[in-house]
Amino acid sequence: MEEYQLYLELDRSRQQDFLYPLVFHEYIYGLAYSHDLNRSIFVENFGYDNKYSLLIVKRLITRMYQQNHLIISANDSNKNRFLRYNKNFYSQIISEGFAIIVEILFSLQLSSSLEEAEIIKSYKNLRSIHSIFPFFEDKVTYLNYISDIRVPYPIHLEILVQILRYWVKDAPLFHLLRLFLYDYCNWNSIFIPQKSIYTFSKKNPRFFFFLYNFYVCEYESIFFFLRTKSFHLRLKSFRVFFERIFFYAKKGHLVEVFVKDFFSTLTFFKDPFIHYVRYQGKSILASKNLPILMNKWKYYFIHLWQCYFDVWSQPRTIRINQLSEYSFHFLGYFLKVGLKHSVVRGQMLQNGFLIKIIIKKLDIIVPIIPIIRLLAKSKFCNVLGNPLSKPSWADLSDFEIIARFLRICRNLSHYYNGSSKKKSLYRIKYILRLSCIKTLACKHKSTVRAFSKRLGSEELLEEFFTEEEEILSLIFPTTSSTLRRLHRNRIWYLDILFSNDNDLINHD
């Protein structure tokens, strides 16, 4: 027991982290806004020159401490223009400063922990989200039940701040952080207070998702502890993800909550065939055993969110489905388990017989309809999938137009190359290829048929498309049997770190 307590305790040098002075260091904001800083805030609103000044941040923090939050005047926005611009400045500057400070701290802790565990190489190889799908192919076909879980958002930002407070002991920093969040939410939620956390997540995504990740890691740490029990304490590679302060007090509270509803609940949690996968706010929980164990895990999540995080979640939001009769979306793919029938002819002496074999197979399919809707939203085609030209790109050079279409096509093909059925992917390539030709024909004031005949003899196009044989195969039909075999097989890449379709078709 003493060994476990020593493991769960933070190092004393890390308990005394004093980060508050970093708020007043100019290089912190230089790191945060070296590329994203909106200079119009300073030039138009404050009258400063283009050079960033730390004096603005200091004055704003002083105003935050001196401002009386109990008195709200209806004419404040008219009387004090500087205060009105302060609110934009809080959301764009100070929140990014907080994000940089805590990111630097925890990136150093993560790097040191990975170095001690000697797993840096494997950690980098497992960062790709495509590494999840080979895991699905190996494990899911042997499982029977699956549950699709949506991680609920916290109802108040204070919950996120408290979770971060367990890791960093710095009272002045968190006092300023609470003051900033209170001031921001009070200003942006005078009329609609329920949307304060939603507004903050949209205007300050970097800082919000940093806090949200800690919220997710907090409940997952207890989940992993119950899943592996004391065995996880010897896994050094995971130690940075487990909370150590007040851990056993929280565990005792969970046991007390569970005993009220289930007798010896924790003793039935042992399930060697359970698998858990999460990306962002969506989790997949699958098991081979009876659904009663899945049902216990379901109520574990609900009680944990309600009793510990004050997040309301209802049992009917988490459904347990039989895997053979259920299909689900994950990371931009449509997944379902199908049955593959095969017949094998056998012969024993003079007697011949047929053996029917049924094999479970995981089908990973490209969701063609959502992608077409996204392309239609970006004006590459209409809602029916008919290609359209991009008149807004007509002012660009031919090379730039082709490069943009190639980039989009390469991104989509790169990400969806693991599909088991490539016909949908070929349709997407056809839409982009014909949209590219229509855009070029519109620019040169020609018809699509006439421009298509010129396309084969265009030197610029030939040089560009023959630069990479893979890129050539994405836009034009290929005659190479080798490339055709590659296109029929699943290909998973280890360099994909995101799955946002909006980023896949973004030409910038």
UniProtKB/Swiss-Prot annotation:
Signal peptide positions (record): none
Gene Ontology MF annotations: RNA binding
Stored Pfam families: Intron_maturas2, MatK_N
Keyword terms: Chloroplast, mRNA processing, Plastid, RNA-binding, tRNA processing
GO process terms (BP): mRNA processing; RNA splicing; tRNA processing
Entry's localization field: Plastid, Chloroplast
Cellular compartments per GO CC: chloroplast
Record-stated family: Belongs to the intron maturase 2 family. MatK subfamily.
Role noted for this protein: Usually encoded in the trnK tRNA gene intron. Probably assists in splicing its own and other chloroplast group II introns.
Protein name: Maturase K
Protein source organism: Lotus japonicus (Lotus corniculatus var. japonicus)
